[in-house]
Curated annotation (Swiss-Prot):
Physiological role: This protein is one of the two subunits of integration host factor, a specific DNA-binding protein that functions in genetic recombination as well as in transcriptional and translational control.
Span list, region Disordered: 54-73
PANTHER family: DNA-BINDING PROTEIN HU (PTHR33175), INTEGRATION HOST FACTOR SUBUNIT ALPHA (PTHR33175:SF2)
Assembly and interaction partners: Heterodimer of an alpha and a beta chain.
Primary gene name: ihfA
A GO cellular-component term linked to this record: cytosol
InterPro entries noted in UniProt: Hist_DNA-bd, Histone-like_DNA-bd_CS, IHF-like_DNA-bd_dom_sf, IHF_alpha
Name listed for the protein in its UniProt record: Integration host factor subunit alpha
Keywords assigned by UniProt, alphabetized: DNA recombination, DNA-binding, Transcription, Transcription regulation, Translation regulation
A single MF term (Gene Ontology): DNA binding
Amino acid sequence: MGALTKAEMAERLYEELGLNKREAKELVELFFEEIRHALEDNEQVKLSGFGNFDLRDKRQRPGRNPKTGEEIPITARRVVTFRPGQKLKARVEAYAGTKS
């Protein structure tokens, strides 16, 4: 099983919408740039029928160096989370196990 890349997304836009390759690539880049900007501005990104991107603050917590066993604090940080929407979940579940 492979991964869908931005280049492949642009290629599909080129093939299915008739955009030229440069326009398709720019559209994909702009889409992800808008998501990045919204998250940088502390905004939630809601894509109807797909899911939500959120920012979550994680507190500092104790961790361990796996080689030495030494306790090391894991610093507080902000992470991006994605919660799939109900429609996306339902479509993925409908196709689960149908492809090898």
